[in-house]
C-alpha cells in the first residue's frame, strides 16, 4: 500500500501521469462554460405579475342531504349486493373494494357529492356511508366566515371585485 502511494507521488513529480485520471476524461470533457451557454439559451423569460387580491371563485362543495337519503342508500345497497344481502342492510360490509367502488361511484353521480380520498378508508359498512351522506357541508371559506362575522372596529376584510 505504501509502495503504491510512493509510486504515485514520484510519478506526479516526474509528470508521468500515473496518478488519477483527469476529470474531463471521466465525464466526457464537458466544460462549465458550455453548460452555462446551453442553460442561458434554454431559459425562457417570464413576465412577473403582481399578486392578485381578487376574491377566488367559490368552490362547489356545498351539499345538503336529501330527506330520503336512507331509502336511496338502501336501494343502492340492495341493487349492488343482490340476494346475498343480510337481514340488516346497514351492517353490510364494504371490505370488498369492487363493491365499495360501485356503491360510492353510483352515490357520487346521483347525489353530486363524492367521498374524498382521505375518508375512503373510513367507509367500512353501509352505516358509515349513511353517516357521511347524512352530514351537510356548508360552502364557506374561512375568509368568508370572517367577513360575515362581527369583527372589532379596527379590523375589516374586503375583497376587490
Swiss-Prot record:
Disulfide-linked positions: none
Residue ranges, annotated region (Disordered): 27-51
Keywords assigned: Mitochondrion, Ribonucleoprotein, Ribosomal protein
GO cellular component: cytosol; mitochondrial large ribosomal subunit
Record-annotated membrane-spanning stretches: none
Annotated localization: Mitochondrion
Top-level taxon in the UniProt lineage: Eukaryota
Pfam family, one: Ribosomal_L50
UniProt subunit comment: Component of the mitochondrial ribosome large subunit (39S) which comprises a 16S rRNA and about 50 distinct proteins.
Family according to the record: Belongs to the mitochondrion-specific ribosomal protein mL50 family.
UniProt-recorded name of the protein: Large ribosomal subunit protein mL50
This protein's encoding gene: MRPL50
Amino acid at each position: 500500500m505504501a509502495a503504491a502511494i510512493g509510486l504515485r507521488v514520484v510519478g506526479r513529480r516526474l509528470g508521468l501521469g500515473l496518478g488519477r485520471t483527469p476529470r474531463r476524461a471521466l465525464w466526457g470533457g464537458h466544460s462549465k462554460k458550455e453548460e452555462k451557454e446551453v442553460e442561458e439559451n434554454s431559459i425562457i423569460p417570464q413576465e412577473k405579475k403582481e399578486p392578485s387580491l381578487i376574491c377566488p371563485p367559490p368552490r362547489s362543495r356545498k351539499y345538503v342531504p336529501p330527506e330520503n337519503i336512507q331509502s336511496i342508500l338502501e336501494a343502492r345497497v340492495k341493487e349492488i349486493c343482490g340476494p346475498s344481502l343480510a337481514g340488516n342492510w346497514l351492517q353490510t360490509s364494504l371490505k370488498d373494494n369492487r363493491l365499495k367502488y360501485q356503491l360510492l361511484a353510483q352515490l357520487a353521480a346521483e347525489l353530486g357529492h363524492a367521498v374524498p380520498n382521505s375518508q375512503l378508508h373510513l367507509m367500512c359498512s353501509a352505516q358509515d356511508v349513511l353517516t357521511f351522506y347524512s352530514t351537510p357541508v356548508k360552502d364557506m371559506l374561512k375568509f368568508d366566515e370572517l367577513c360575515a362575522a362581527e369583527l372589532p372596529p379596527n379590523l375589516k376584510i374586503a375583497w376587490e371585485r
